[in-house]
């Protein structure tokens, strides 16, 4: 299951994404959910750091790029919240566990449960079957997609945020911790859209200038009829090419759509852009996947 067949590899190269149902067991998914429950129960976020996560461009710049809480989260475990969950003083308007959009961006490095999933033999075998020589883990996120108001993620390419030279060196690994359905906000892809380069980049502003990030280029209008929904069952793994266009809709159902996702970069012969918002640090250089 972890080693891709020639036909699976061909489909991934053709479409820019690939679904592998049953990659993780129900027990592994439960272990992640239980651990996240413990992390959330211990959550202590200062008022000035209660950053609402948004996927619309201007709101991204205001809510993320202008705050050091986001820009310095690459080597930490931090909390990002849905829109409208705080009053004007930063107090929760909904139960805290229902307010979180995601936790990022270093669960893979600092938490034993997520570290073991990320570096599992299955994941390493999968990476080897993709031909990755020296993959490193650049970031990880636990995404909640809360019931009733889990925010939409507008069409984008991961390489807009995680840019490399040459392109084609970033791979998203998206694991369904719960069933992802049409109703609760499954992923949608434009098959084959990974072959046209990157139309937009989010770059970190020079030190001392504001805001913290800005966008170069713009996201072109996408033909909605080209998007294909990708509902999957709990335990499925979705491989996501760094340049494939994908999105997810708002979750208006009464069930969450939790997922654990991390990004790999082929480090051999690759330059990680110094303009990316996310940078390796002395405390956490990008860890090697193969252990």
Swiss-Prot record:
Modified residues (Phosphothreonine): 55
Regulation of catalytic or functional activity: Activity is increased by ascorbate. Inhibited by myristoyl-CoA.
Known EC number: 1.14.11.-
A single MF term (Gene Ontology): 2-oxoglutarate-dependent dioxygenase activity
Family according to the record: Belongs to the PhyH family. PHYHD1 subfamily.
Functional note: 2-oxoglutarate(2OG)-dependent dioxygenase that catalyzes the conversion of 2-oxoglutarate to succinate and CO(2) in an iron-dependent manner. However, does not couple 2OG turnover to the hydroxylation of acyl-coenzyme A derivatives, implying that it is not directly involved in phytanoyl coenzyme-A metabolism. Does not show detectable activity towards fatty acid CoA thioesters.
Name of the molecule in the record: Phytanoyl-CoA dioxygenase domain-containing protein 1
Species this chain originates from: Homo sapiens
């Amino acid at each position: 299951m972890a080693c891709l067949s020639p036909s699976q590899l061909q489909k991934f190269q053709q479409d820019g994404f690939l679904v592998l149902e049953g990659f993780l067991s129900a027990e592994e998914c439960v272990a992640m959910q239980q651990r996240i429950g413990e992390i959330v129960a211990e959550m202590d976020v200062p008022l000035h750091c209660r950053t609402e996560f948004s996927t619309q461009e201007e709101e991204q710049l205001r809510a993320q790029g202008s705050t050091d809480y986001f820009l310095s989260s690459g080597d930490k475990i931090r909390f990002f919240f849905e829109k409208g969950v705080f009053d004007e003083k930063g107090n929760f308007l909904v139960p805290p566990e229902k307010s979180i959009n995601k936790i990022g961006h270093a669960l893979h490095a600092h938490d034993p449960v997520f570290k073991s999933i990320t570096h599992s033999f299955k994941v390493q075998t999968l990476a080897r079957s993709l031909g990755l020589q020296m993959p490193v883990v650049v970031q990880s996120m636990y995404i909640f997609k809360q019931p009733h108001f889990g925010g939409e993620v507008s069409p984008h390419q991961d390489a807009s945020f995680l840019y490399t030279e040459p392109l084609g060196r970033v791979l998203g690994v998206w694991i369904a911790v719960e069933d992802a359905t049409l109703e609760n906000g499954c992923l949608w892809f434009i098959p084959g859209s990974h072959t046209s380069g990157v139309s937009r980049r989010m770059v970190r502003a020079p030190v001392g200038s504001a805001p913290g990030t800005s966008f170069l280029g713009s996201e072109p209008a996408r033909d909605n009829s080209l998007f294909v929904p990708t509902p999957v069952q709990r335990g499925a793994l979705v491989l996501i090419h760094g340049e494939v266009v994908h999105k997810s809709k708002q979750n208006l159902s009464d069930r969450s759509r939790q997922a654990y996702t991390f990004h790999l970069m082929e480090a051999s012969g690759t330059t990680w852009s110094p303009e990316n918002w996310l940078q390796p640090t002395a405390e956490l250089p990008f860890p090697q996947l193969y252990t």
